[in-house]
Amino acid sequence: MRSFVRHQLWPAVALLLAITVITGFIYPLAVTAVGQVVFPNQAAGSFVAGTDGRAIGSSLIGQAFSDPKYLWGRPSAAGADGYDANASGGSNLGPTSQALIDRISAEVDRLRTANGDAPIPVDLVTTSASGLDPDISPAAADYQAARVAAARGIALDLVRQAIARHTDGALLGFIGQPRVHVLAVNLDLDGLVR
């Protein structure tokens, strides 16, 4: 029995404790420390600050905009009212789900009422996997540009310039699609962040 404890049980318990300390304490603390030093903004949540320095959003999490003077992001299925970071996730509704069909139909009606009868980009009626996507396609931004310009009483070209300033291309030129950051465009148009 003593041989079993000394040769098998004690090394197993010691290894368990060592791995617990390394992976549960040392590694997370080291990664957090490196993150705070090398990427302080990202480690703190990638907050976007207004001109007064106060956090007004995050560059990683979408927000609900419904005022006609703002670009609207993708619909969100995260939480009861959407854009709930505590309930991140898609709707899990299948393509034959009547609830999904009704939601998309209502979104199409809302967009047509606000923007006219132009073809609606698909990302304005479909949710992302997380339900918190902060970006839309350039086509979705351009689709809304005339509405935003009219609601603000500014030239359409000024809205398109703001969209162009906050459009990122594909990563490394070939990974992913070009995307427009909704919050950044809206803040730019408000003159809050440059």
Task: Annotate each predicted stretch with a short phrase.
Residues 3, 11, 23-24, 29-31, ...:
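Flexible, solvent-exposed loop/hinge segments and secondary-structure transition points
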Residues 7-16:
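Residue-level signature of transmembrane alpha-helical entry/exit and packing/kink sites
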Residues 147-194:
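Extracytoplasmic/periplasmic C-terminal soluble domains
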Residues 1-3, 194:
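Short, low-complexity, intrinsically disordered N-terminal peptides in bacterial proteins
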Residues 19, 138, 142, 179-183:
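Short alpha-helical patches at coil-to-helix transitions and adjacent helical residues
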